[in-house]
């Protein structure tokens, strides 16, 4: 193949990306980066490079991270038992000290560390810094009864001031999913999927992207590995009761986002090279995309 022909695929890629670059320029995207990906060095690098590329392409990325595996490992090291109820970690006062230490002192530093090689743009904050995330104690229902799971928070308010200030300064905010209560001052462990969705809605983000270690939302798991490529908010709401516990907070987050002003929410496989770029800048994309319901005829003509 000649040098000219070698360059043609690159030109086609740029042509395909151009309308998406134009559409997304100046828009905010919120990317939830899971703790599972942080234990894989290759995935960390694959996440950092595209994040900086979309920044330099004119988008405004905000990263929200979890740290489940790292928290579990540290709890084990301290001899504290990891217990889960309703898919959420039971967080005692002692466990909360570990959660704060791991999310703000270890995982966030890791995200920042793999990002800094691409430029001094990432700035780490938690839900305690200038209170971007406020929460109250969350009591999930199990068999119809509320259950106390300790210092686990339900988001009550998002203050976008600190995040917007960083974005206006050309930075990439990296947010740990810890929140402080407005009433009693307690600090809570907030599910990172939930925090990312609430932040995306408050920022009026163009899209919420949830990076995970599966291909997307499966149509009939475990009977089929067929991935649903696109569904509406109402279609997703119908599926929620039958989803696996691990997918529920991710898909609930997507549902909350698109019903509160976010144009699209996507669950994508972080193991796929350049998955963020493929989802944003190509016609096909990867993973599962959730979109708002189409307005009814009466809504459209009123």
UniProtKB/Swiss-Prot annotation:
Disulfide bond positions: none
Any single GO BP term: arginine biosynthetic process via ornithine
Subcellular location: Cytoplasm
Coiled-coil stretches: none
GO cellular component: a single term: cytoplasm
Enzyme type, top EC level: transferase
First-listed, main subcellular location of the protein, grouped into a coarse class: cytoplasm
Name of the protein in its database record: Acetylglutamate kinase
Annotated organism of origin: Streptomyces clavuligerus
